[in-house]
C-alpha cells in the first residue's frame, strides 16, 4: 500500500483480523489449556477413576451452512469430541471412548458468530492489568500518603500503605487494616526470613512490639490474628482446617492469584526473578513491595500512571471464550461426579459415554452469547457498521468500569493511545471515552497489550532496507518517534529541518538525525470511521467524532454512488465487510442472474449464491447485484457482485449532490435543510427497508392454537391476502390493519355467555362447548408494503416449549421526505424542512438548479471547514470527471496545501469546461447564483459544490407518532411515555411557562387537572366538548395531587387546608 521501492511495502492489515486472531488463539491454545486443567475424578472408595485425554480432541465440521443457520434460527457451531478413559483400579482395566462434550459456536468469515440465527459479535475489553501500582494522595493535612495497590487476575485489590511513623499496613477492607508482618507470617514466613529478605530491616523492627511478636510467633497465631482482623470476628477463634479453607476462598484466591500477566508485571516492577509459572502472590512479593513503598517515602522510584496503556490489558475473544470453557468444564466435572456416585449406588457399570453429557458446554456458550454484556448483536446498518463494531474496545462489562463511576481522567485521551486507540472515534453520551475504537494498524500482542507498528531508522544508512517494529506501550517510551506522516518523510523534505516527535509521553521538536522511529502511514492514529473523512485535519475533533458515528448510521440507498472526494480506504472497507461477492479463483462466467453466478475454473463448475433482499437487524435491505456478464473471463479477487452500499467494490454510503451554502426564507434555520423535489422523483435518496413480523403458536390448557383462514367476526377485506392455510401470500401489498397470519386461541366461555341450546347440550350430553378468541397477527401502523418472504419455522420436538414460529417479511420503499435526517462527512447534520419544486430552487449560471441548500452559519462556529474543501473539490471533480483520494495532514508537504489543490482543480475545471464562473479570482470557490422564483441574482456570491451527503437511519416514518386515546400509568393516571407504548405528551415545565406567559389561567388549569389526570372529569370534558356546553367543575382533587399527598403521608406529614369564614373568622378544618 505504501512505501517506496527501496523500503518494501506495508499493507493495511485486514480489518477483521483482530477477531480472527482471537478465535484462532482460542482454538489453538485456549481449548487445550482448559482441557488439560480438567482433573481426574474418583469415586468415594477410590476404585474408579475418570479422565480426559485432551491430546486427541477433535472439532467436527458444522453440519449446516451459515445461510441455513440464519434462515432456520439455528446456531452455526462445531461439535467437540474428546477421548475419555474410565480406569478400574482393582482390576487395572481401562475403557477408552471418544465422547461428545458439546457444541462450540464457530466464527464465520465476517468475524462474527451465528447463535439462534442471529449474528453476534464479541467486543474486546480493556481492563486494569494485574500487578502492583504505586500512587500518592494528599491527606487532610496536605501530607503525601504513599500506597501500593496489588491487583489480582480476578480484579481483587490488596492495598499496602505507609503511615507517619513509617509503619506499613495491608488494607484488607475499607475499615480493616493489618500489619504487614502479620500478613507475611500468615502466608508462611517467619520473622528471620522477613528480616533477611528486606532492604530496611531496622524499619520493620522499629514497629515490632512484644504484642506483635506474640501474634507472629507461629504461623497458626498469625493466621488466627489475620482471620480475626479480616472477618471482624470477636472472641478467640480456634485454628482449624475449615478456617484455613474459608480464608483461602475469601481472601487468597480472590486477591492473591496474579495470573501469567500479573506475575510478569510484578517481576518487572519489583526487579524479581520468580518463575513465570508461579502465578500466586508470595511473601517475597509482599516484602519487595513494602521495600519499594519505603523507597517511595524517601523519594526514590517513580509513581505509576494508572491510565497509561502499559498498565492496561486487552481481554480478547480468546480470553472470554476460554473463561466460558473453564466454567463449562467445572460444571461438567460436577455432573460426572454425581453420575459416578449414582451409578455405584445403584450398582450399575458406568462407561465414559454414560458419564458425560453435552448440556453444560452447549448451554454455557449459548447463555454467554445471549446474555454476556460484551456479546452484542452485530449492527448491520451498512458495511462500515459491521466492520467498526468488531473493532470496538470497551472499558465497560464484568470486571470493568460503569458509565456512572468512571471519572474524567479515564475517559480522556492519553499520549499512550497514539497509534493504538483512535483519539476521535468514541460513543456520545454517558459512555463517552469508555467505548473506543482500534486504530487501523493496531494489534493485540501476546501479553494482552496493544501494539503499534513503526519504521526503524538506521543512522547514516539511508540505502539500507528499513525494518518495521511492533512496539507495546511500555517499549515505545524509550524511542524518539517522528510524529510526521510517512508520505511526507519519504520525500526527504524533513532531513534538513526539525521535526515534531514524541518521547516519554511528551511532544517535542527535535533534529531529524535524533529520530529513532517514524510512523508508517498517515492514518495510523485513526480508526476506520475517522479515516474515511477527507480533510479531517481542517475539522474540529468533536465534529469528526460525530461524523465517524453518523457514517455508521447511513442507510444503503437503492442506487449508490462512489464519492468524488475520498481517502482511499473505501475499497478495503467494502472488501473486508464481506458484502461484495468476490471470485476465489480465476475462471469464465457461464451464467448469471439475480440469484446466482455460475463460473468454471480449475476444471470445476462453481455456483455462487447471491443475497436477495435480506433483512439486517436495523431493518435495512442487504442485496447483491451481479457486476459480470456471461462469457467474460475473471481473475482471482475480482468483484462478481456488488452488495448494499458498495459500487465497484468501493464503499458507497451516499450521493454526490449539488449543494449551495446560503439562507433561504428561514427554511434552513438551526441546521434545517432545504431540498429539491428532484431528489424525490429521481429516486436519488430512496432506500428499501425490510420489517419482520412474527407470531408463535402455543399449546394452551384449553388446547393448541390454530393457524386458519376461518376467522369469525372479522371483515372479509382484512383477510383478503390470506391463503388456504391462513398465512399471507407472497407478493401481496398489505396496508395497516390487514391480517398477516390468522390465529385462533381456544378458551372456555363463561356460563352466562352460552346460548340456550348450548346449555341444553351440556346438560343432556355433557359436551363442553369451547369458543375461540382471535389472536391474529395484524399489520401495525406505518407497516404498509410488499410481502417478500414468509418463513414457517417448526422446532424439533414440536412440544409446547418449542412453539412454531411464523415470520412475515415486508419490504418498504422509502423516498426522502420532510423530517428525515441527512448528514455530510464532517459532522454537518440536519433535518429536511421543506421540499421545493425544482423551478423554485436557486440555479447556477449554466441553468442547473441546486439539489440542497445548507445553512452557512453551521460552518464557522462549529469549525468543520473540511466540508468547504470537499464541496469545492467535488464540484471540480464532477466537471473534470475525476475522483480524488486524499491523505490527511497534507499541510506537511507545504503550507495551505489543501487550499492550493482545491483552487488549482477549480481553475482547471473552469478552463476545460469554458465556464469562467467555476473559478472567479475575486471570490475563488464562490459563484453568483440566481433565485429560481424571480430569476434575479442573489446579492452575495455563494459557495456551491458537490459534497457527499448521506441519508441516515433516523427517519420520520419510524419516529412520527400521534395518540387520540391510549393507556394511562396506574400510579399517576397520566399517559404513558414513548411511541412503543402508544404514549402521549405531557404538559411539562416549559409548556406551563409558555401558557403562563400568555396569561391563559383557565386553559392551564384544565390542561393540568381535568384533561390530564382527573379520572372522572376527563370523560366529562370529552362529552361536553362534543355536545357543547360548560365543563362541570369536579369536587375532588386530580390523581397526581392525591399522589403527592400520599407521598407526604409516607414521610409522616399530613396535608390539610383551612377555610376561614369572613363573618366570624371561624376556621373550618377540612382534610384533603
Swiss-Prot record:
Q: Name one GO cellular component term.
A: DNA-directed RNA polymerase complex
Which terms does the UniProt entry file under GO BP? DNA-templated transcription
Q: What is this protein called?
A: DNA-directed RNA polymerase subunit beta
Any single Pfam family the record assigns to this protein:
RNA_pol_Rpb2_6
HAMAP family (UniProt xref): RNApol_bact_RpoB (MF_01321)
Spell out the PANTHER family in the cross-references.
Answer: DNA-DIRECTED RNA POLYMERASE I SUBUNIT 2
Reactions that this protein is recorded to catalyse: RNA(n) + a ribonucleoside 5'-triphosphate = RNA(n+1) + diphosphate
MF term (GO), any: DNA binding
Which key words tag this protein in UniProt? Chloroplast, DNA-directed RNA polymerase, Nucleotidyltransferase, Plastid, Transcription, Transferase
Q: Which family does it belong to?
A: Belongs to the RNA polymerase beta chain family.
Q: What is its EC number?
A: 2.7.7.6
> Which InterPro entries does this entry report, sorted A to Z?
DNA-dir_RNA_pol_bsu_ext_1_sf (IPR042107), DNA-dir_RNA_pol_su2 (IPR015712), DNA-dir_RNAP_su2_dom (IPR007120), DNA-dir_RNAP_su2_hyb_sf (IPR037033), RNA_pol_bsu_bac (IPR010243), RNA_pol_bsu_CS (IPR007121), RNA_pol_Rpb2_2 (IPR007642), RNA_pol_Rpb2_2_sf (IPR037034)
Gene3D superfamilies listed in its UniProt record: 2.40.50.100, 2.40.50.150, 3.90.1100.10, DNA-directed RNA polymerase, beta subunit, external 1 domain, DNA-directed RNA polymerase, subunit 2, domain 6, RNA polymerase alpha subunit dimerisation domain, RNA polymerase Rpb2, domain 2
Assembly and oligomerization:
In plastids the minimal PEP RNA polymerase catalytic core is composed of four subunits: alpha, beta, beta', and beta''. When a (nuclear-encoded) sigma factor is associated with the core the holoenzyme is formed, which can initiate transcription.
Question: Which gene specifies this protein's sequence?
Answer: rpoB
Subcellular location per UniProt equals: Plastid, Chloroplast
Q: What does this protein do?
A: DNA-dependent RNA polymerase catalyzes the transcription of DNA into RNA using the four ribonucleoside triphosphates as substrates.
Amino acid at each position: 500500500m505504501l512505501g517506496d521501492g527501496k523500503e518494501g511495502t506495508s499493507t493495511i492489515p485486514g480489518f477483521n483480523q483482530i477477531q480472527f486472531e482471537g478465535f484462532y488463539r482460542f482454538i489453538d491454545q485456549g481449548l487445550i489449556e482448559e482441557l488439560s486443567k480438567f482433573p481426574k475424578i474418583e469415586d468415594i472408595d477410590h476404585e474408579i477413576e475418570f479422565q480426559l485425554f485432551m491430546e486427541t480432541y477433535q472439532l467436527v465440521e458444522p453440519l449446516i451452512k451459515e445461510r441455513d443457520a440464519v434462515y432456520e434460527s439455528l446456531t452455526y457451531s462445531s461439535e467437540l469430541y474428546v477421548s475419555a478413559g474410565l480406569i478400574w483400579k482393582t482390576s487395572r482395566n481401562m475403557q477408552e471412548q471418544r465422547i461428545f462434550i458439546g457444541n462450540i459456536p464457530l466464527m464465520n468469515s465476517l468475524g462474527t458468530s451465528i447463535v439462534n440465527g442471529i449474528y453476534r459479535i464479541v467486543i474486546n475489553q480493556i481492563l486494569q492489568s494485574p500487578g502492583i501500582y504505586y500512587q500518592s494522595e494528599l491527606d487532610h493535612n496536605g501530607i503525601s500518603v504513599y500506597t501500593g495497590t496489588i491487583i489480582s487476575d480476578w480484579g481483587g485489590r490488596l492495598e499496602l500503605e505507609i503511615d507517619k511513623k513509617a509503619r506499613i499496613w495491608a488494607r484488607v477492607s475499607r475499615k480493616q487494616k493489618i500489619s504487614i508482618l502479620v500478613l507475611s507470617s500468615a502466608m508462611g514466613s517467619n520473622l528471620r526470613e522477613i528480616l533477611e529478605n528486606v532492604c530496611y530491616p531496622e524499619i520493620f523492627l522499629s514497629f515490632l512490639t512484644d504484642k506483635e511478636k506474640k501474634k507472629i510467633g507461629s504461623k497458626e497465631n498469625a493466621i488466627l490474628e489475620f482471620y480475626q482482623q479480616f472477618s471482624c470476628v470477636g472472641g478467640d477463634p480456634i485454628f482449624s482446617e475449615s478456617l484455613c479453607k474459608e480464608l483461602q476462598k475469601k481472601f487468597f484466591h480472590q486477591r492473591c492469584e496474579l495470573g501469567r500477566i500479573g506475575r510478569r508485571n510484578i517481576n518487572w516492577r519489583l526487579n524479581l526473578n520468580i518463575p513465570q509459572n508461579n502465578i500466586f502472590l508470595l511473601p517475597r512479593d509482599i516484602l519487595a513491595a513494602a521495600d519499594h513503598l519505603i523507597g517511595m517515602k524517601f523519594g526514590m522510584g517513580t509513581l505509576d500512571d494508572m491510565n497509561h496503556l502499559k498498565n492496561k490489558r486487552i481481554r480478547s475473544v480468546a480470553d472470554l471464550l476460554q473463561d466460558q470453557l473453564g466454567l463449562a468444564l467445572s460444571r461438567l466435572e460436577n455432573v460426572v461426579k454425581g453420575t459416578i456416585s449414582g451409578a455405584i449406588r445403584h450398582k450399575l457399570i458406568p462407561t465414559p459415554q454414560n458419564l458425560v453429557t453435552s448440556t453444560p458446554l452447549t448451554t454455557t456458550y449459548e447463555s454467554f452469547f445471549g446474555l454476556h454484556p460484551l456479546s452484542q448483536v452485530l449492527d448491520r446498518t451498512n458495511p462500515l457498521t459491521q466492520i467498526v463494531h468488531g473493532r470496538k474496545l470497551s472499558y465497560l462489562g464484568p470486571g470493568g468500569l460503569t458509565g456512572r463511576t468512571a471519572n474524567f481522567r479515564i475517559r480522556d485521551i492519553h499520549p499512550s493511545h497514539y497509534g493504538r486507540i483512535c483519539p476521535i472515534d468514541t460513543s456520545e453520551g454517558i459512555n463517552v471515552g469508555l467505548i473506543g475504537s482500534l486504530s487501523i494498524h493496531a494489534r493485540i500482542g501476546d501479553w494482552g497489550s496493544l501494539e503499534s507498528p513503526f519504521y526503524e531508522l538506521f543512522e547514516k544508512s539511508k540505502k539500507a532496507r528499513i525494518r518495521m517494529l511492533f512496539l507495546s506501550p511500555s517499549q515505545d517510551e524509550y524511542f524518539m518517534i517522528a510524529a510526521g506522516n510517512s508520505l511526507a518523510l519519504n520525500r526527504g523534505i524533513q532531513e534538513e529541518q526539525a521535526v515534531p516527535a514524541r518521547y516519554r509521553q511528551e511532544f517535542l521538536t527535535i533534529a531529524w538525525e535524533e529520530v529513532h522511529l517514524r510512523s508508517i502511514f498517515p492514518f495510523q492514529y485513526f480508526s476506520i470511521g475517522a479515516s474515511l473523512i477527507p480533510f479531517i485535519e481542517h475539522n474540529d475533533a468533536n465534529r469528526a467524532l460525530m461524523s465517524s458515528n453518523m457514517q455508521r448510521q447511513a442507510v444503503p440507498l437503492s442506487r449508490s454512488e462512489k464519492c468524488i472526494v475520498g481517502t482511499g480506504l473505501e475499497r478495503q472497507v467494502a472488501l473486508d465487510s464481506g458484502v461484495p461477492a468476490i471470485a476465489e479463483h480465476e475462471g469464465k462466467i457461464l451464467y448469471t442472474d439475480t440469484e446466482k453466478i455460475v463460473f468454471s475454473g480449475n476444471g470445476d463448475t462453481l455456483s455462487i449464491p447471491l443475497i436477495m433482499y435480506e433483512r439486517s437487524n436495523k431493518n435495512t435491505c442487504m442485496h447483491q447485484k451481479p457486476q459480470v456478464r456471461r462469457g467474460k473471463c475473471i481473475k482471482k479477487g475480482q468483484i462478481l457482485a456488488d452488495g448494499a452500499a458498495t459500487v465497484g467494490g468501493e464503499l458507497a454510503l451516499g450521493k454526490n449532490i449539488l449543494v449551495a451554502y446560503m439562507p433561504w426564507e428561514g427554511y434552513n434555520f438551526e441546521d434545517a435543510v432545504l431540498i429539491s423535489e428532484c431528489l424525490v422523483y429521481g429516486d436519488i435518496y430512496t432506500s428499501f427497508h425490510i420489517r419482520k413480523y412474527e407470531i408463535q403458536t402455543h399449546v394452551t390448557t384449553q388446547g393448541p392454537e390454530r393457524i386458519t383462514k376461518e376467522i369469525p367476526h372479522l371483515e372479509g377485506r382484512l383477510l383478503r391476502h390470506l391463503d388456504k392455510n391462513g398465512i399471507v401470500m407472497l407478493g401481496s401489498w398489505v396496508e395497516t390493519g390487514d391480517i398477516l397470519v390468522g390465529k385462533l386461541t381456544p378458551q372456555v366461555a363463561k356460563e352466562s355467555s352460552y346460548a340456550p341450546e348450548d346449555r341444553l347440550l351440556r346438560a343432556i350430553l355433557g359436551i363442553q362447548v369451547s369458543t375461540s378468541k382471535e389472536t391474529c397477527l395484524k399489520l401495525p401502523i406505518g407497516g404498509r408494503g410488499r410481502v417478500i418472504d414468509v418463513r414457517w419455522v417448526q422446532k424439533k420436538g414440536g412440544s409446547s416449549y418449542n412453539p412454531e414460529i411464523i415470520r412475515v417479511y415486508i419490504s418498504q420503499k422509502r423516498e426522502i421526505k420532510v423530517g428525515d435526517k441527512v448528514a455530510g462527512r464532517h459532522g454537518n447534520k440536519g433535518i429536511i424542512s421543506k421540499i421545493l419544486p425544482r423551478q423554485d430552487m436557486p440555479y447556477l449560471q449554466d441553468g442547473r438548479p441546486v439539489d440542497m441548500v445548507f445553512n452557512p452559519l453551521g460552518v464557522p462556529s462549529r469549525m468543520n471547514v473540511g466540508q468547504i474543501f470537499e464541496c469545492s473539490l467535488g464540484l471540480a471533480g464532477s466537471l473534470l470527471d475525476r475522483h480524488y483520494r486524499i491523505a490527511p495532514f497534507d499541510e506537511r508537504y507545504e503550507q495551505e496545501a489543501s487550499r492550493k489543490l482545491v483552487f488549482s482543480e477549480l481553475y482547471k475545471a473552469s478552463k476545460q469546461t469554458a465556464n469562467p464562473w467555476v473559478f472567479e479570482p475575486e471570490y475563488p470557490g464562490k459563484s453568483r447564483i440566481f433565485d429560481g422564483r424571480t430569476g434575479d441574482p442573489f446579492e452575495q456570491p455563494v459557495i456551491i459544490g458537490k459534497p457527499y451527503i448521506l441519508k441516515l437511519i433516523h427517519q420520520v416514518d419510524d419516529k412520527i407518532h400521534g395518540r387520540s386515546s391510549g393507556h394511562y400509568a396506574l400510579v399517576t393516571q397520566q399517559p404513558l411515555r414513548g411511541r412503543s407504548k402508544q404514549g402521549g405528551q405531557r404538559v411539562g415545565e416549559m409548556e406551563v411557562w409558555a401558557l403562563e406567559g400568555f396569561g391563559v389561567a383557565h386553559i392551564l388549569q384544565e390542561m393540568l387537572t381535568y384533561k390530564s389526570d382527573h379520572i372522572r372529569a376527563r370523560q366529562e370534558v370529552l362529552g361536553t366538548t362534543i355536545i357543547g356546553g360548560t365543563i362541570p367543575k369536579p369536587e375532588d382533587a386530580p390523581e397526581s395531587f392525591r399522589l403527592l399527598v400520599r407521598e407526604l403521608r409516607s414521610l409522616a406529614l399530613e396535608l390539610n387546608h383551612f377555610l376561614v369564614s369572613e363573618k366570624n373568622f371561624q376556621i373550618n378544618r377540612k382534610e384533603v
